[in-house]
Amino acid sequence: MKKSALLNSELSYLVATLGHTDEITICDAGLPIPDGVSRIDLALTHGVPSFIETVRVMLSESQIEGAIVATEFAEVSPELYQALVAELQCEEEKTGKVLSLTHVSHEEFKQRTESSKAVVRTGECTPYANVIFQAGVVF
C-alpha cells in the first residue's frame, strides 16, 4: 500500500504523467466539466471531499508553478479563497519557489478548463471554489 497522502489511483496516475506547464483543474461540485476533458469525480456528498483537502493532497504530490482562479472566488467566497492562498504560500515556503496566482473572470476560467489535462471534481459546495494548477518542475 502507498505510504504517501495520495491514495486515489486516478489522481496518482495524473500526477505521474504531468509535464511542465500541463494544467489540472480542481473544482467544486457545480463547475461544468467540458466534454472531452478527463473527469476524476471524487464527490461523495455535499462537502466530501472538500476543496481545500483536495488541494492539500494534490500539492503534497505535485510541483506547481502557478494557479489560476476566478476573480469571483475572492469576492464571493473570501474565507475559502484565503485558505487557498495560505496553502499556496505554504507551498512556496516548502519549495522555495515563487508561485504565480492569476485572476480571470469566471467565464474565462470555464473556457480555460477545456485545455486542462483533467478536471478533479470535489464535493465542495462553496461558490467559485475552483483552481487550475499549472505543473512545474522539481529542479
Curated annotation (Swiss-Prot):
Pathway: Carbohydrate metabolism; D-ribose degradation; D-ribose 5-phosphate from beta-D-ribopyranose: step 1/2. It comes from the Bacteria. The active site is at H20 (proton donor). This is D-ribose pyranase. GO terms for molecular function: D-ribose pyranase activity; intramolecular lyase activity; monosaccharide binding. It is found in: Cytoplasm. It catalyses: beta-D-ribopyranose = beta-D-ribofuranose. Keywords: Carbohydrate metabolism, Cytoplasm, Isomerase. PANTHER family: D-RIBOSE PYRANASE. Its EC number is 5.4.99.62. Coiled coil: none annotated. NCBIfam families: PRK11797.1. One of its GO terms (cellular component) is cytosol. Homodecamer. InterPro entries: D-ribose_pyranase, RbsD-like_sf, RbsD_FucU. SUPFAM superfamilies: RbsD-like. It holds the Pfam family RbsD_FucU. Substrate binds at D28, H106, Y128, A129, N130. It comes from Vibrio vulnificus (strain YJ016). Catalyzes the interconversion of beta-pyran and beta-furan forms of D-ribose. Belongs to the RbsD / FucU family. RbsD subfamily. One of its GO terms (biological process) is D-ribose catabolic process. The gene is rbsD.
